[in-house]
C-alpha cells in the first residue's frame, strides 16, 4: 500500500494499531489539514474461504479504527475493499453469492457496517444505478474484454464530508493490472 501526494501530510501512520492485524502492511493513513486519507488493502477471504473468519475480525477492527479517526476529523477511505457490495457491483451475482470470496454475505455485512456506520460509497452516491462499471477483472478466460468484472475498489467518505466530493470515477480504460484506477474529485478551500 502506498500513497503519492502533492500535499505534504501532517502525519503518516502505518497499520491500525492492533498486532494481529498489522503484520501484512494493509493500511496507510495520512493526516491532511481537512481530513484523514486512509489507503487500505482489505484481506481477501481466499479461494477456499480459509480466511473468511479472519476477514470478519479484520472488518470489525478496521471500522473501529476509522471511527476513532473520525472523532478528530472526516475520513476518506480508498483502496481494494475486496467485496462487491451490491448485486449491481459484479457481472454475475447469482453465480457468486455465498460461493466466492468477495461476495460472501459476511463480507457484504462488513461493507454494510461501513455504509450504515457513517461512510458513503462515493461512486454509488453519484451513479446509484450504473451497471457494468467494474474495477477488477479476473485474468482467467478473458474476463476484461467481456467486462465480466467486479467493483471492489472504492472511495468512501465520512458522510458529513460528502458535499466536498464533486464526482467519483472508474477508469476502466486504463490497463496495467487486473484492477483499474478509481478516484474522486474534491472541492476544498485553500
Task: Please provide the spans of the model-predicted regions.
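Short hydrophobic/aromatic beta-strand or adjacent loop that forms the aromatic wall/cage
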Residues: 1, 24-29, 151-153, 179-183
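Structured beta-strand-rich core segments of catalytic domains in phosphoester-bond hydrolases
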Residues: 1-45
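Conserved beta strand-loop-helix elements of the APE1-like EEP
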Residues: 1-12, 140-163
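Active-site beta-strand termini and strand-to-loop segments that position acidic
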Residues: 6, 30-33, 158-159, 184-189
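Surface-exposed cleft-lining segments at the edges of enzyme active sites
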Residues: 17-18, 43-59, 95-99
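Short Gly/Pro-enriched turn/cap motifs at secondary-structure boundaries
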Residues: 18-19, 144-147, 172-175
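Metal-dependent phosphoesterases centered on the DNase I-like endonuclease/exonuclease/phosphatase
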Residues: 58-148, 152
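Surface polyanion/phosphate-binding segment centered on an Asp-His-Pro turn
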Residues: 169-190
Amino acid at each position: 500500500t502506498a500513497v503519492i501526494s502533492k500535499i505534504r501530510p501532517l502525519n503518516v501512520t502505518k497499520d491500525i494499531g492492533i498486532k494481529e492485524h498489522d503484520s501484512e502492511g494493509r493500511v496507510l493513513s495520512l493526516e491532511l489539514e481537512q481530513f484523514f486519507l486512509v489507503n487500505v488493502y482489505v484481506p481477501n477471504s481466499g479461494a477456499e474461504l480459509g480466511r473468511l473468519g479472519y476477514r470478519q475480525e479484520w472488518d470489525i477492527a478496521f471500522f473501529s479504527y476509522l471511527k476513532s479517526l473520525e472523532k478528530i476529523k472526516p475520513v476518506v477511505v480508498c483502496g481494494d475493499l475486496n467485496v462487491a457490495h451490491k448485486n449491481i457491483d459484479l457481472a454475475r451475482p447469482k453465480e457468486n453469492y455465498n460461493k466466492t470470496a468477495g461476495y460472501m454475505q459476511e463480507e457484504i455485512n462488513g461493507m454494510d457496517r461501513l455504509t450504515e456506520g457513517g461512510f458513503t460509497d462515493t461512486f454509488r452516491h453519484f451513479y446509484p444505478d450504473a451497471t457494468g462499471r467494474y474495477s477488477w477483472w479476473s485474468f482467467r478466460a478473458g474476463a476484461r474484454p467481456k467486462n465480466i468484472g467486479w467493483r471492489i475498489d472504492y472511495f468512501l467518505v465520512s458522510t458529513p464530508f460528502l458535499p466536498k466530493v464533486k464526482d467519483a470515477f472508474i477508469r476502466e480504460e486504463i490497463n496495467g493490472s487486473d484492477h483499474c484506477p478509481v478516484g474522486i474529485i474534491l472541492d476544498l478551500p485553500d
